[in-house]
Each structure stands twice: as C-alpha cells, then as structure tokens.
Regions:
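Non-catalytic terminal extensions of ATP-dependent helicases
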Residues: 1-119
Length: 119
C-alpha cells in the first residue's frame, strides 16, 4: 500500500500534499467505508488523518481512474525501479512496463534506462 502524502507528490497533487481541513465535517475522523475504499485502491489507510483528506483522496483516485491513469500501486512499484513522473503515465503503459519487468524475473530489461524512459 502507498502512503497518501507520497502518492500526492507522485501525482503532483499540491492540494492533497498540503491538505488542511477547512470545515468542521472535514476534521472528523474518516469513516470505515472511506478507509476501506482507500485500502482497496492501494492507499495505506492508517495515515489518513481525517474525513476531508479521505474525501479528497477518493476524488483523486476516481478522477484518475476515469482518465485512465496509473494506479497508486503501479506508481509505487515503478518508482521503486527508478522510473520518474510515473504519476503521469497511463494505466495501460504502466501495466505493460510492469509485465516487461515481471517477465524479466523482476529485473529491469537490459538496455532500459528507467530515469530517462518515456512511455
């Protein structure tokens, strides 16, 4: 699972990275349903501090899914291999690269430079 703040930086979501609750409802603890949704979608729920942050995370996850962008788990895995700007990758591109790495016994394919690779 992915830390929500790391995820915010990976997808360049400044509003999420610097989130501060404004309204009283945002300051309440996140609901069990919100935390379950976040965990199911790859976010580490124990570090979600309140209902407002959970709502914003869920909104970002849904928007990114509609846009066909990489998931939190895909982003984290590919960043571990040294790829950059993975938060901008399409789901399909991330999936294909993960398959290539998996087919290569979880090593980067020879000749592939993760730091400069663009899908």
């Amino acid at each position: 699972l992915v830390d929500p703040i790391q995820y915010a930086f990976s997808i360049s979501a400044d509003d999420l990275a610097n989130y501060e609750p404004t309204f009283a409802w945002e300051m309440a603890p996140a609901s069990p349903k919100q935390l379950e949704y976040l965990e199911k979608h790859g976010i580490f729920p124990e570090t979600v501090t309140n209902c407002g942050m959970a709502s914003l995370l869920i909104e970002k996850l849904k928007d990114r899914q509609i846009e066909g962008l990489a998931t939190p788990k895909q982003i984290r895995l590919l960043e571990r291999y040294g790829f950059t700007h993975v938060g901008l990758w399409m789901f399909e591109s991330a999936s294909k690269m993960i398959t290539r790495i998996a087919n290569n016994n979880w090593f980067l394919p020879r000749g592939l430079d993760a730091k400069t690779y663009q899908p």
